[in-house]
Amino acid sequence: MNPFRIFRQPNKVRHALYAIGALAASFAITSVPAIADDSKQLGKTPVAIAIHGGAGTILKSSMTPEKEADYKSVLTQAVQHGYALLQKGEKGEVAVVETIKILESSPLFNAGIGAVYTFDGEHELDASIMHGGSKNAGAVAGVKTIRSPIEAALLVMNESPHVMLSGRGAEDYAKENGLEQVDNTVFDTEFRKQALDKAKARMQQVSSGYGSQQGNERFGTVGAVVLDQGGNIVAGTSTGGMTAKRYGRIGDSPVIGAGTYADNESCAVSATGHGEYFIRYNVAADICARMKYQGLTLNDAANTVVNDVLVKAGGDGGVIAIDAKGNVAMPFNSAGMYRASVDINGKVKVAIYKD
């Protein structure tokens, strides 16, 4: 099933088609065969990819086998599609965007269709992308009418002199450059509406009000990091933000250095979690800096920041990271993180909980 055909259907039909497609694909999840990698024989840089669909309070007790299969189905589809593009020689930024667009098209994840609601019942979307070779980056924040926020972030990176555009200005720029515009209701889902109602009820029960909500509504992001045949590493992130957010709140996802960062001399990182902490501790860039200036391995740098720095600060979440050799790290300090990867040998990994 082509996930992008879903876009042309009315909301109810689109969601029904997605559910059928996801269920059909779920039967192939339990054992994912390795993908042949011919890059070594061809003398090219081996390629690799890692993706995430958000971290947070993902309790096994509330996860049915059918629902888990649906999540893993979309993760598998996305990571294999991105890997196939890399094998064909596509640039890293193309693979990142096309991979994330699959996740943005799924109502399961908090990005694009399926994005959470603001306090006022709308969707405000953020995304960013960064190229580790050129250090070019692009981001959009608080957009409501752009079909694919990650595509808009790529447009900002490639075609504008800026790094970040926000709100109506970002929407106008995307429209002028031919990106698809949609009504904000395209991103509606009943599941997220119920989450908004629960968040509002919780906020009314505590004296601190706004910002006091706990649970899954604090989390939710999608992202991808890749190593392409040119030896470049690229990172991208897209999100609907925090459920019941107000006042134009922007999290870490569109902030270069916090939710997204890439440097060929160290690593590429896409983050997910409690965004305020990721901004304050500059999480994505910190991981890369520990590799570049302290000589830490990718795994040590990522684990130190996620499971030491963030934990001590009180920040929950995780990251996916990749270095110029194709090593992948996917640490998280929450109950779970939707994630998948294909390494330089073509080995596929799809997981939700701790190994």
Residue ranges of predicted features:
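Alpha/propeptide regions of enzymes that mature by internal proteolysis
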Residues: 36-355
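Bacterial N-terminal signal peptides that target proteins for export
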Residues: 2-20
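Bacterial N-terminal signal peptides
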Residues: 18-30
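Short, low-complexity disordered leader/linker segments with a strong preference
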Residues: 5, 32-36
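Polar helix-capping/helix-linker motif
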Residues: 8-10, 29, 189
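Short linear sequence elements within intrinsically disordered, low-complexity coil regions
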Residues: 9-12, 23, 32, 343
